[in-house]
Regions:
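Alpha-helical transmembrane segments of polytopic membrane proteins
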Residues: 36-48, 106-118, 169-178
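Membrane-helix interface "capping/anchor" motifs
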Residues: 58-67, 131-140, 189-194
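Membrane-proximal helix-loop-helix units in multi-pass membrane proteins
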Residues: 83-139
Length: 194
């Protein structure tokens, strides 16, 4: 399979999962804020997700400069997502108040589990498409897969989640992205090395 075919399949599969999660979420929780802004946000994060796949997998991964560029992309986009969550939150409860609210904890765990499930499905699909394709830096390719999968799960879920408290967003959405990047890095050696 050529690199172009793999990139096309990766973007199509990730985009499909992203769209499915948005559709299910908006069906259950129709956005009360301006729907145009939500759609613009979804489009921007979708384009960013496609760029992650294109930049992360589109060139030879054996060159040192390319590895530095890819790690920079993983860290920059993860940080940008956490900043985005901070900016979109409408309140920050003291941590002890957040932890004592059982409804908030249940909702945070529910969002985190859904983000992990959809993100893990995206990573699994990317691992199948890119299986045994990176002899030089399979862990880095795994981290890129984790970032792309995390964008599917965490970003799409964040756009349909009605809960905008900062701790909820950081734990239920941001931490799941970080966990999926770490999982991709760990599993990349087994799945992506020839």
């Amino acid at each position: 399979m050529t690199v172009g075919t793999r990139i096309t399949r990766s973007i199509a599969l990730s985009g499909l999962l992203f769209g499915v999660l948005l559709a299910f979420g908006w069906q259950r929780h129709p956005p009360t804020r301006a729907i145009a802004w939500a759609l613009i946000g979804a489009l921007i994060w979708g384009i960013l997700q496609a760029a992650v796949i294109l930049v992360g997998f589109g060139r030879s991964s054996g060159k040192r400069l390319h590895r530095v560029w890819r790690w920079g992309m993983v860290l920059t986009i993860s940080t940008a997502f956490l900043l985005y969550l901070t900016l979109t939150s409408d309140s920050i409860l003291p941590l002890r108040h957040f932890l004592s609210d059982s409804k908030a904890i249940r909702h945070t765990l529910s969002c985190g589990i859904h983000a992990l499930l959809f993100g893990a499905m995206a990573i699994a699909l990317l691992f199948v498409v890119w299986r045994k394709s990176d002899p030089f830096s399979p862990r880095l390719s795994g981290a890129v897969s984790g970032l792309a999968g995390g964008l599917v799960g965490s970003v799409a879920l964040e756009m349909v989640c009605p809960h905008l408290e900062a701790w909820h967003l950081w734990i239920g959405h941001g931490l799941t992205l970080v966990m999926l990047v770490a999982f991709g890095w760990y599993a990349g050696r087994r799945w992506l090395a020839p």
